[in-house]
From Swiss-Prot:
InterPro entries linked: Cytidylyl_trans, KdsB, Nucleotide-diphossugar_trans
GO MF term (any one): 3-deoxy-manno-octulosonate cytidylyltransferase activity
SUPFAM superfamilies in UniProt: Nucleotide-diphospho-sugar transferases
Cellular localization per UniProt: Cytoplasm
Gene: kdsB
EC number: 2.7.7.38
Entry's family note: Belongs to the KdsB family.
GO cellular component, one term: cytosol
Name this protein carries in UniProt: 3-deoxy-manno-octulosonate cytidylyltransferase
Gene Ontology terms describing biological process: CMP-keto-3-deoxy-D-manno-octulosonic acid biosynthetic process; lipopolysaccharide biosynthetic process
Catalytic function, reaction form: 3-deoxy-alpha-D-manno-oct-2-ulosonate + CTP = CMP-3-deoxy-beta-D-manno-octulosonate + diphosphate
Cytoplasm listed as a keyword: yes
Length: 257
């Protein structure tokens, strides 16, 4: 499906105290802070504005050297990246209808076409939020809890997100752990689009049981009865960086380019 380019802004939530990889935004990838590489992906996509939302002065100072990137100093009490971006939207003064792309701060290889596509998907759907997914064909990815899986309905909207391998193939997985063509299994890509007004509504939703169990903020949207449009993207999205092992793989990928 080809989607036209629509105007959008990008906001990148970044916190220093990531439990699995402390100081993640400032970790070096190819000799440069990770947050620099993520922000530059947003700029390359043609965003009207690019903001980094952080509660840490070290991250703010690192971003200050980037041309065309703004910084929002936010509270340190936010429960999720989307809560942080809602404050960023208020600081930036965006109108409620502005399309905001939430680009996770651990996605240094996000293709520009994918960033534009999620904004276009929101524009062309009736959903409150839009996101992307790609197919899974490796067992190690399907059973990796750091790689989020999702299932959709017949209208291309998310039914559920999980760290567990969903859907569970009862018969096949009784004897093997290899994905089969009966899926397809989908990997969620940490990229969302919604309008600035919906970000403010998000902050009024209470985190539900599912969000707290899975530690996945997008489940708050589903639990509250809202819809998330999903596009299975043809663009190659390397997994995000959550652990020291992920960072080492990303470093090697850069060296191999």
């Amino acid at each position: 499906m080809s989607l036209e380019i629509v105007p959008f802004v990008v906001a990148i939530p970044a916190r220093f105290s990531a439990s699995r990889l402390p100081g993640k935004p400032l970790r070096l990838l190819g000799g440069r802070p990770l947050i620099h590489r993520v922000a530059e992906r947003a700029l390359s996509a043609g965003a009207r504005e690019v903001w980094v939302a952080t509660d840490d002065v070290r991250i703010a100072e690192a971003v200050a050297s980037l041309d065309g990137v703004h910084v929002a100093i936010t509270a340190n009490t936010h429960l999720s990246g989307s809560d942080r971006l809602a404050e960023c939207a208020r600081i930036a003064g965006w109108d409620p209808e502005v399309c905001v792309v939430n680009l996770q701060g651990d996605e240094p290889f996000a293709p520009a076409a994918g960033i534009r596509a999620v904004a276009a998907l929101l524009h062309h759907s009736n959903a409150d939020m839009a996101t992307l997914a790609t197919t899974i064909d490796k067992s190690e990815d399907l059973f990796n809890p750091n790689i989020v899986k999702l299932v959709c309905n017949a209208h291309g909207e998310a039914l559920y997100f999980s760290r567990a391998p969903i859907p569970w193939n009862r018969d096949t997985f009784a004897t093997t752990r290899e994905p089969t063509p009966l899926g397809p299994w989908l990997r969620h890509i940490g990229l969302y689009a919604c309008n600035a007004g919906f970000l403010q509504r998000f902050t009024t939703m209470q985190p539900g049981t599912l969000e707290q169990i899975e530690s996945l903020e997008q489940l708050r949207v589903l639990e509250a009865g809202h819809r998330i449009a999903v596009r299975i993207t043809p663009e190659h999205f390397p997994p995000g960086i959550d652990t020291p092992e992920d960072l080492a793989k990303a470093e090697k990928a850069l060296e191999d380019v």
